[in-house]
């Protein structure tokens, strides 16, 4: 192996030419193997040093190291250039044209049931009432017994109520938010003024006017000397706050096991065609003395009134929604306008 300065310089020059000719990093890697790898001329020269006489080895070693350093420096310089070219090409390929119009961000909206539920809560909180909540999985005691439903009442059957397994657990998915009223009477100090919004469940098929999961809001007032006049005044104020100052209400006799006397409440409401008419809204009445007793309240001292209505039903005639399925199917094209208007 020729270890002369001329031979080593020639090997280094060949390596520099090969590196300079490399058009990309892959080609540079091939050139590196040829000129800096284990079988490269300078690598062979390094191994040949061992065969030299001692007096020649020192000078030859210096020449080899100088040549190898020259080659390594040329490699790193070319590699830096190719890396910069690659990064520049990536920047060009992935460049963002900041002059293009930005994509409009989609704005979300709260669900209309949430909007109207909060609106109703605000109405009653402004009147000094409190918001009460309760569990959606209820016992039959709170859902039926304490509300004066007889043991053979049809509402208790599998055809109307979702019963929780195992059979005989006496647990159900609540069919109304009335259990929250009973819990409020047991847990709160008198007098009581609470509004109870929440989800309820019944074995209805989903169609234009029914859904198996729906929302209700109920109100309960228990105090000394309350009468139907107080109930009527409360419903009038509620209706005007929710539907507008021209809204009127009326009551029609009805029957509910948990109120006595009981009534249906209708509202006189303008329709989308410019007319107006009576629309059934919900149920109401004076709290049945049996319900007060079941809740630990003396009906000789206290009286109470209660009312309840479905939120989906309220939305339907308040906003002119013909099909209840639109409310529950979660289409953002339907819900967005309600969130904006809230």
UniProtKB/Swiss-Prot annotation:
UniProt keyword Metal-binding present: yes
Signal peptide: none
Key word Metal-binding present: yes
Keywords per UniProt: Aminoacyl-tRNA synthetase, ATP-binding, Cytoplasm, Ligase, Magnesium, Metal-binding, Nucleotide-binding, Protein biosynthesis
Binding site for Mg(2+): 260
Cellular component aspect of the GO annotation: cytoplasm
Localization per Swiss-Prot or TrEMBL: Cytoplasm
Pfam families linked: Phe_tRNA-synt_N, tRNA-synt_2d
Listed EC numbers: 6.1.1.20
UniProt family annotation: Belongs to the class-II aminoacyl-tRNA synthetase family. Phe-tRNA synthetase alpha subunit type 1 subfamily.
Name listed for the protein in its UniProt record: Phenylalanine--tRNA ligase alpha subunit
Gene: pheS
């Amino acid at each position: 192996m020729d270890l002369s300065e001329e031979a080593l310089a020639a090997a280094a020059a060949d390596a520099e030419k090969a590196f300079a000719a490399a058009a990309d990093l892959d080609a540079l890697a091939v050139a590196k193997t040829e000129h800096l790898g284990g079988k490269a001329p300078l690598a062979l020269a390094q191994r040949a040093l061992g065969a030299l006489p001692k007096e020649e080895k020192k000078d030859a070693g210096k020449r080899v190291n100088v040549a190898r350093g020259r080659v390594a420096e040329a490699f790193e310089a070319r590699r830096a250039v190719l890396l910069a070219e690659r990064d520049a090409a990536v920047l060009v390929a992935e460049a963002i044209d900041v002059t293009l119009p930005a994509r409009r961000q989609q704005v979300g909206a709260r669900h209309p049931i949430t909007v109207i539920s909060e609106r109703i809560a605000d109405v009653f909180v402004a009147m000094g009432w409190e918001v009460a909540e309760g569990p959606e999985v209820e016992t039959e005691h709170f859902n039926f017994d304490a509300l004066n439903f007889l043991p053979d009442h049809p509402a208790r059957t599998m055809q109307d109520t979702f019963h929780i397994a195992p059979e005989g657990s006496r647990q159900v998915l609540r069919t109304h938010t009335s259990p929250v009223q009973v819990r409020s009477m047991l847990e709160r100090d008198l007098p009581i003024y609470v509004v109870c919004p929440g989800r309820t469940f019944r074995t209805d098929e989903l169609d234009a006017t029914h859904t198996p999961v729906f929302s209700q809001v109920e109100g309960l007032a228990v105090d000394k000397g309350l009468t139907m006049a107080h109930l009527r005044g409360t419903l009038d104020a509620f209706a005007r706050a929710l539907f507008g100052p021209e809204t009127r209400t009326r009551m029609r006799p009805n029957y509910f096991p948990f109120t006595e006397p009981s009534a249906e409440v209708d509202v006189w409401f303008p329709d989308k065609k410019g007319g107006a008419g009576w629309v059934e809204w919900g149920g109401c009445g004076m709290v049945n003395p049996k319900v007060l007793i079941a809740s630990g309240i003396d009906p000789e001292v206290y009286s109470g009134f209660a009312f309840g209505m479905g939120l989906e039903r309220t939305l339907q005639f308040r906003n002119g929604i013909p099909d209840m399925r639109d409310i529950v199917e979660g289409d953002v094209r339907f819900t967005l306008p309600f969130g904006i208007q809230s």
